[in-house]
Amino acid sequence: LVERYATLGGVCLNVGCIPSKALLHTAFVMDEVKTMAAHGISYAPPVIDLDKLRAFKAGVVKKLTGGLAGMAKARKVDTVRGIGRFVDAHHLEVTLTSGDARTPAGGKKTIRFDKAIIAAGSEAAKLPFMPDDPRIVDSTGALELPLIPRRMLVVGGGIIGLEMANVYSSLGSRIDIVEMLDGVMLGADRDLVKVWEKKNAPRFDRVMLKTRTVSAKATSAGIEVAFDGAAAPAAPQTYDLVLVAVGRTPNGKAIEAAKAGVNVTDRGYIDVDRQMRTNVPHIFAIGDIAGAPMLAHKAVHEGHVAAEAASGMKSYFDARQIPSVAYTDPEVAWAGVTEDECKAQVIKYRKALFPWAASGRAIANGRDEGFTKLIFDDATHRIIGGGIVGAHAGDLISEVGLAIEMGCDAVDIGKTIHPHPTLSESIGMAAEVFEGVCTDLPPARKP
């Protein structure tokens, strides 16, 4: 196993999913405490100790990376620390490093292989006009919590940018978000995103859509950024911290996979078949480098397929759905096909929606702004997609994913007894809405 960093686990475990969720949990608790005044319970304003918060985050990561290292050792996995680049179809040259992926440890090592699985991931995309300044960070830098800025700009309205905007806003920063497209959270249906927008309108100073950054200048007062577009401020704005979250670039070219004969696209992706096999039969590729969506759970599933296929098993990647979750507040989650995709692909569908304003548990939690939506094939009534917006939506979407994989229809889901009172029963109730038998909502008006 060739790994350039000091710990195993890749982006997700070290500088992605896990540390961000540790900080998002902290942010959620801070925000939740503020709402308790309406319940008759008030607290003093929080006192933030950044060193302790960083230590908490680091402890979470260390516990998991340590466990992963232990499992690798137990399975007798030989780890080589360094940066690997292909020499040909059966050799990889590794430049040995100290573990920070930069400092040479001295020497190189050539590894001969019969079969290889490429899991080299991706790097945060950069904007060429951004100066080299510690006050301009990517997601990795933002997770290090260098400071709590008075004003912060998030460039990019995708999931990563919005999650970090959530964290820094809860810690006390004033946030501007700029997105060149006409909406944030690309990929999710707009009705889900609208709930997020309404809830977060008071949280951020500006959400500038159809707007882009055109220049940035480092000054003693901060990073001075100029904008252009529909919502661009007339004058440049100055920020204490700028997060650039404009996507990620796969590392297909960086590892020189083409020298092994592997087809690498202009953007750095590696094409694979359903066994995760490249055009070179004994070389496989998984994860970010094998194509969108760039999600850890997709990569893990692909890794299982590739390992089994490499060992001779007839394993294939044939998932009907890959769930996506924005761990914002409220969370937004979806699985299967979206309404937008149904319309684009001319799929005949029907949807059913259960509002959390009718959920006893959501009301008791003081978080009834969300809803659960299921999408069914118009002819078969089998579920083909679904979306949930609200607190803990990410924990709820798995049932929708399983229902899609199992080919459940609305009756299967509606007749499944869900525990009461829970948020998960909104899934069963949405199916009942589709069948016209939901007694938890007023009767539907006849056309």
For each feature predicted by the language model, list its residue ranges.
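Active-site substrate-recognition segment that forms the wall
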Residues: 160-180, 198, 277-282, 290, ...
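Flexible, glycine-rich terminal cap/loop adjacent to redox cofactors
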Residues: 1-5, 11, 18, 22-29, ...
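Glycine-rich flavin
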Residues: 3-148, 181-185, 189-192, 198-203, ...
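FAD-site-proximal beta/loop scaffold in flavoenzymes
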Residues: 133-149, 235-310
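Short glycine/serine/threonine-rich phosphate/pyrophosphate-binding segments
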Residues: 11, 136, 161-164, 170, ...
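Glycine-rich dinucleotide-binding loop and its adjacent helix/turn
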Residues: 17, 115-174, 178, 207, ...
